[in-house]
């Protein structure tokens, strides 16, 4: 679909690039010739991913441990990257989410999500955008959202609110920075099953399950290659006039059912929710253990 060296001379940072959607998109960028940086909190996972990708595809993948909730950590990371040369692209993929009745959320649970998705995405975007502005460089920023930004996000309110904020940031900065040649766009994926997301959003359901297909007009989940291709198109040269857009890639699920979790969750009992909380906690505990390695 794309020329083999389409992204030669591109230098792209992918937040949350050690696993899931971020890893998939970083892989495609690498295959097409870009130098890749991946960041996240789980250094062992990042290192493993960087080695795996270079063993398979060659090229350069560098891993940097960074908590994007901390602006100073981002500035240190950007300094480190810029010492080797400026970035040409940023993929804001790092996120956090889980399903919960909103009345069950504690302030800590709310800020755990909003600090990553809302604050962290802005910190990343602004830190790199300012570098480009100061050095008169063009660049492309892509943020991963959801189709809920145009409908609603019941049972995922912290993430839905935060991603709606990133959506308006994307549009606002596309206008504000457009005359500098800095483009901002967003991708709103539908169901692209990954282990981490499914453990928190569909606990107990296998990533290969077709249980929700009836809510998707195309009657299937997304294939990772489809998401990778869209992310490549938005990052590559050739569509420089495209900016400020949020593109849904969800098999029209947001048109058929608002693309959210309401249909599957609105009839759960208190006991059901207790079970879900326990499954999500187990998944979170496992992730915390990996971050301590």
Question: What is each model feature region?
Answer:
Residues 16-20:
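Conserved glycine-rich cofactor-binding loop
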Residues 75, 97-111, 130, 134, ...:
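Conserved mid-core segment of classical short-chain dehydrogenase/reductases
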Residues 79, 107, 116-136, 174-175, ...:
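Amphipathic alpha-helical dimer-interface segment in Rossmann-like NAD(P)H-dependent oxidoreductases
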Residues 88, 96, 103-123, 142, ...:
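Catalytic Tyr-X3-Lys loop
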Residues 91, 178, 183, 242-244:
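Short, small/polar-rich loop/turn modules that mediate ligand/substrate recognition or access, typified
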Residues 133, 142-165, 170-179, 191-192, ...:
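Catalytic loop of short-chain dehydrogenase/reductase
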Residues 179, 191-216, 257-287:
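A glycine/serine/threonine-rich, flexible loop-to-helix segment
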Residues 186, 206-242, 249-251, 276-293:
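C-terminal helical subdomain
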């Amino acid at each position: 679909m794309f020329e083999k060296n389409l992204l030669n001379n591109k230098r792209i940072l992918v937040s949350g690039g050690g696993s899931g959607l971020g890893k998939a998109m970083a892989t495609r960028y690498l295959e097409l010739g870009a130098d890749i940086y991946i960041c996240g909190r789980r250094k062992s996972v990042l290192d493993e991913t960087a080695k795996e990708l270079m063993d398979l595809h060659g090229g350069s993948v560098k891993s940097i441990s960074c908590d994007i909730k901390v602006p100073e950590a981002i500035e240190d990371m950007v300094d480190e990257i810029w010492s080797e040369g400026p970035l040409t692209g940023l993929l804001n993929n790092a996120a956090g989410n889980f399903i919960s009745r909103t009345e069950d959320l504690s302030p800590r649970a709310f800020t755990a999500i909003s600090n990553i998705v809302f604050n962290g995405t802005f910190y990343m975007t602004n830190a790199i955008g300012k570098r480009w502005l100061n050095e008169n460089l063009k660049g492309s920023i892509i943020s991963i959202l959801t189709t809920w930004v145009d409908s609603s996000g019941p049972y995922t309110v912290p993430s839905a609110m935060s991603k709606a904020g990133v959506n308006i940031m994307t549009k606002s900065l596309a206008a504000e920075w457009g005359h500098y040649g800095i483009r901002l766009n967003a991708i709103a994926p539908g169901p692209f099953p990954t282990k981490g997301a499914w453990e928190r959003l569909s606990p107990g359901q296998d990533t290969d399950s077709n249980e929700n297909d009836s809510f998707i007009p195309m009657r299937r989940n997304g294939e990772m290659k489809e998401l990778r291709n869209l992310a490549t198109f938005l990052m590559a040269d050739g569509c420089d006039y495209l900016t400020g857009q949020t593109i849904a890639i969800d098999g029209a699920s947001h048109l058929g059912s608002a693309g959210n979790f309401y249909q599957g969750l609105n009839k759960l009992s208190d006991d059901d929710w207790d079970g879900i909380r326990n499954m999500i906690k187990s998944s979170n505990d496992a992730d915390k253990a990996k971050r301590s390695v």
